[in-house]
Amino acid sequence: MWSLPASEGESATAHFFLGAGDEGLGTRGLGMRPEESDSELLEDEEDEVPPEPQIIVGICAMTKKSKSKPMTQILERLCRFDYLTVIILGEDVILNEPVENWPSCHCLISFHSKGFPLDKAVAYSKLRNPFLINDLAMQYYIQDRREVYRILQEEGIDLPRYAVLNRDPARPEECNLIEGEDQVEVNGAVFPKPFVEKPVSAEDHNVYIYYPSSAGGGSQRLFRKIGSRSSVYSPESSVRKTGSYIYEEFMPTDGTDVKVYTVGPDYAHAEARKSPALDGKVERDSEGKEIRYPVMLTAMEKLVARKVCVAFKQTVCGFDLLRANGHSFVCDVNGFSFVKNSMKYYDDCAKILGNTIMRELAPQFQIPWSIPMEAEDIPIVPTTSGTMMELRCVIAIIRHGDRTPKQKMKMEVTHPRFFSLFEKHGGYKTGKLKLKRPEQLQEVLDITRLLLAELEKEPGGEIEEKTGKLEQLKSVLEMYGHFSGINRKVQLTYYPHGVKASNEGQDTQREALAPSLLLVLKWGGELTPAGRVQAEELGRAFRCMYPGGQGDYAGFPGCGLLRLHSTFRHDLKIYASDEGRVQMTAAAFAKGLLALEGELTPILVQMVKSANMNGLLDSDGDSLSSCQHRVKARLHHILQQDAPFGPEDYNQLAPTGSTSLLSSMAVIQNPVKVCDQVFDLIENLTHQIRERMQDPKSVDLQLYHSETLELMLQRWSKLERDFRQKSGRYDISKIPDIYDCVKYDVQHNGSLGLQGTAELLRLSKALADVVIPQEYGISREEKLEIAVGFCLPLLRKILLDLQRTHEDESVNKLHPLYSRGVLSPGRHVRTRLYFTSESHVHSLLSVFRYGGLLDETKDTQWQRALAYLSAISELNYMTQIVIMLYEDNTRDPLSEERFHVELHFSPGVKGVEEEGSAPTGCGFRPASSENEERKADQGSVEDLCPGKASDEPDRALQTSPLPSEGPGLPKRSPLIRNRKAGSMEVLSETSSSRPGGHRLFSSSRPPTEMKQSGLGSQCTGLFSTTVLGGSSSAPNLQDYARSQGKKLPPASLKHRDELLFVPAVKRFSVSFAKHPTNGFEGCSMVPTIYPLETLHNALSLRQVSEFLSRVCQRHTEAQAQASAALFDSMHSNQASDSPFSPPRTLHSPTLQLQQRSEKPPWYSSGPSSTVSSAGPSSPTAVDGNCPFGFSDQPSVSSHVTEEYQGLGLLQEAPGSGAQEPPLEGQQEPFEQNQSPQEPPVETKKPCQEVAEEVSQPCQDIPEEVNQPCQQVSDICQPCEENHDDVDQTCQEVPQISQPCEDASQLYQKVSKEVCELCQNSEEVNQPCQGVPVEIGRLVHGFPVGVGGLAQEVLGEVGRPTQEIPEELSQSCQEFSVDIGRLAQEASAINLLSPDTPEVDNPPLEFPGEGALQAQEVSEWVKQQQSYVVPELIDQLSREEVPQVQCPPSNANPQSQSLAPDQNAPLPPATCDSSFSH
């Protein structure tokens, strides 16, 4: 209710009354004094008071705007000020009356919209000279995007890199457009796709986003919302040819936009909404309004809001922010706009406007300057009842979905045209070249056609043999009539002395001395429609692992994740390797996970990050390790013996005793005989296909995924030729391809009815089940060595993901005021999804199986898990390894019981073998309830026994019976904690009374959505139903049953144990999908996916961290020993001018300053074939031919070193120092005094892993910062080349108010801090002690492009490393505190000013190796800034934080050796974290 007017004594100041809602607002007319319509009770008092002079506030806008709900709400509140009277100029007056006749006013709120005569408003303001809330002259500029961008640039506000194309006949020099296949060049500036095309008029909302051909091409066309759509996907890929446009870099925002609404320079309200570019569907609530979520702005973003407000002189102003790679860019300024449907905003806005007007026009009242208290200052953190555990992190490694068979052909080429092609695309720099883009493949096709034409004229002996391969090359490249860029690639490798003669019957005596190229053509391997469906379904099922929301978000299970994601409390990053099928799987998964609609291309570009630059998820299949070569040779030798397997063969081939391996060998018995049978069956198959092709009925027959009989015949004929060599021996490496092909045809082309395919499948599967897993190592030691070689970067990344459990200040947070009824609104669930190929999944599983995670002799649960894994014969498509991290907030933060890890696994899609042969696991079983009063009939894991299953025969229709060791399950270990709070945010009252506390959704998924997916099982299949007792993380079975159209008998809910045996999850149902995409005669099968099985649910974070660290350390030590001899020889042979100098003697010429690049600093040099310039972010292994070296970078290194200690990853390595960058194409050997533990391979990795966390050390520095230090050379470049994440350090920095004469003292301060922090490191248990990081490399581990920076500001660069104490070991938790101190070094920011110049980009062929770790590391640092994040103080106090002090203004004398010039004084950094005005 509104308050009554103030008494006479109080009327000396203007008053503002806060309202509770809409009720009661309509009783008072606008423009009326508050007293005129108040109760008569106060009439007598009013009669005694003479009438007060009024300040008249005029509203001059179109009726649609001035009578809108937000405006009405705000004006009603504005009228509550005693001295303000509001008048609204009618539209008729504005349009038709001369300005002289307009009513006069003291204050004018006027803004432009469609049809508004801005000229008349300007004339009126000149005539009456009112106080303008929003400047009118600036509104002309806001209507032109070119002017908006110009002003933003002048104000130093970050915006995407852009160029303007003016199609103006008077200025032809501004209209230079060159359009390519995957880029445009605008007036000399090149924009690779994806890029954005915006009309220059701000009133034109037809913005187009163009996608690269590698992602599927086409464009997304955005427009003003029409009904439920805000954009539509179009296959058109060429830009518009009429009109003037702004072209700008596409910002990968993970599918969300932030809209900011300012009211004056000190108040900003922000809301997040789904990006219209994602799928174009507008999410609306029950009242039909677009769903938006209020989010909290970071300190940097508040500073941006202030700058925008002041620069455009618009008190009330809306603008759009893009949060990309942890940094914020302004992409649009809309001028006057209000928040819709936020009572708090209406209250705040009216109060600020009223106060602003009164202070300006009635200064005698001396109204204090106060802005409404920010909601984030109110610590609303509801506690949970009981000891619930909270889901904090989900890490999943997932293999791609069902694909077409992969095919490969190799040929040696020596024609000069191939060499010139190789040279043209820069192949000589690395000796290798990968061609995937359509124009590149077209060049290869042109050369092939030319050579074939020449061969027809001059047929020759040896050339005849090549003719067949050239024909095949031509036919594959011509296959679809166009190049999609995803399904074919050509690789060329340079051999200076010719390709070595292979063992396939070629003349080994011929000695080839002339240089040649090995051409490898790869095709096939595309994701099938079935694969897309599998990925989307798995994404949908994955939702059910996350906390549930209060009420149903969209009326179907899994709503918890959607609510979590929409409110920005879900920190999701999806990574995919280089391959198209992997990227499309990731996009389809994201589509299901986040309930998106439409095409995969926009989802792929915005949601999927590319991790292809550094081996995180890719592996160079052409360069096998020596261990792999040995293993393959031994495998081939054993399988070439024409005799039954004997005991010795079993020992040689299956030393691990794997159950699946032994059973496959039992099927094979004599490998050569089985290969003979397989070869005969393939011959028979090709014969049948040829016959079928002669049949007139089959002429136009279309097989699955648009394949023809001719293409199918090509596929099998090639295998027939290659499998049996000229010598009569069999090429064992073709067995996986044969199995691949026959599995594909049985599943997708079964309607052809070809004879013998079932037997071929049985035999080839038996062979493949031996060959495929054994290619990754035969003995345990080999398996582990090969596994770590494949996935060392991924292991380190997982280690980082697990250890970064603290909160991040700048991650998008839901406004606490709007999160009542939400469990711990300030917390986040971090999800990291890694989509990759078979090799990484095999390798990662080998690490867990053979790396010594647990002692199986002492841990029966792990013993059972290993037995289950041993029985798995194939890691099929969509195999998942899932790691879930829980936190128990009731435990001491440093105790081992604080964090709890679970390991789950699924072997992927159901194979084509009989269902009964599937191995059974122990079910999906997160740690179950520890309720003391639990009864046996509550279905706890320990009390399940096979007997119960037989009591319910009609409901126990599971394909996998309960494990026989059911009664022998171990009693609960102390680590199996209480039921996870992660399972639901808020338990409804009804659910808590039900046995087991399962939350039942009020309704299942609407039938419309089921129809869209075309599948019967909606969320099914993620979890094994063998055991679900006590698992509130598991999805609700009743919902599954409902989605299957089944009815649970009422009795089934009486006891939880009975619920376990309901056949709600059809584990292996095969959908004969009536999907239009599902291929041949609608009968293609989409197999369901095996549910997740729990391998272990009682691990501590410390156990897992130490295990991963140990594995990584063992590998690096082994590599170091192997490369020590190599280093010695290389070092002794160095010439005096060798690029490899000993540490501490580095002197290289000063780097010349370059002009600032047009690319934003986060811009990496471009993914090779992925779409997502969305910054990759992951650690890297240094390629042998890596063009980047590790130059000295002291300024950033101090940050990095601190971050590393905080992560617990920094270990002492003796004698570390600075290295000079290696020459291009050379690998960097060890320095003499380097630790033998550190191999060259992983040198850059630590640096990159940290780069993510370094992103925003300076985010919350006070805003009175105006003069950046201009003398520092190129620090922005590391971001541009390699770290999307360091981009924040370059850009998000407020500018310092006093110019910094010399940056040298900053180095002193930072190194002093490093020294102090290092010296404080006491003995603390280290969860990550196994990751040795050579400090010299860490400190100087930035790319070559930054090398000269050291010389600009530093005389001697080797020093920072020397100052680091020897015993450097610090645990994650204890060190997390000290980052705050660094954050307060405001001076540190000067070095990272946006105005600093940059060095040139590296060539495009070398995408930034270090680029990948960007976004996530920043998250960890931000939360360490304790003075900005009040909710962290509690946590930090438990860790005995030293009091944070302002740094002294004088330089530390101990660090003077770092700076060449000690004379320039450095102003003290301010520690005041508030904005001052």
From Swiss-Prot:
Compositionally biased region (Low complexity): 1164-1182
InterPro entries the record matches: Acid_Pase_AS, His_Pase_clade-2, His_Pase_VIP1, His_PPase_superfam, VIP1_N
Subcellular location: Cytoplasm, Cytosol; Cell membrane
Keyword tags: ATP-binding, Cell membrane, Cytoplasm, Kinase, Membrane, Nucleotide-binding, Phosphoprotein, Transferase
Biased composition regions of type Polar residues, renumbered to the chain: 1001-1016, 1446-1460
Single annotated GO MF: inositol-1,3,4,5,6-pentakisphosphate kinase activity
Region (Polyphosphoinositide-binding domain): 382-453
Binding site for ATP: 145, 198, 205, 224, 248-251, 257-259, 275, 320, 332-334
First-listed, main subcellular location of the protein, grouped into a coarse class: cytoplasm
Chain sites annotated for binding substrate: K64, K65, R224, K225, K259, R273, S337, F338, V339, K340
Signal sequence annotation: none
Modified sites of kind Phosphoserine: S940, S983, S1033, S1069, S1141, S1148
PANTHER family registered for this protein in UniProt: DIPHOSPHOINOSITOL PENTAKISPHOSPHATE KINASE, INOSITOL HEXAKISPHOSPHATE AND DIPHOSPHOINOSITOL-PENTAKISPHOSPHATE KINASE 1
Family per record: Belongs to the histidine acid phosphatase family. VIP1 subfamily.
Record protein name field: Inositol hexakisphosphate and diphosphoinositol-pentakisphosphate kinase 1
Lineage, top ranks: Eukaryota, Metazoa, Chordata, Craniata, Vertebrata
Chain's gene name: PPIP5K1
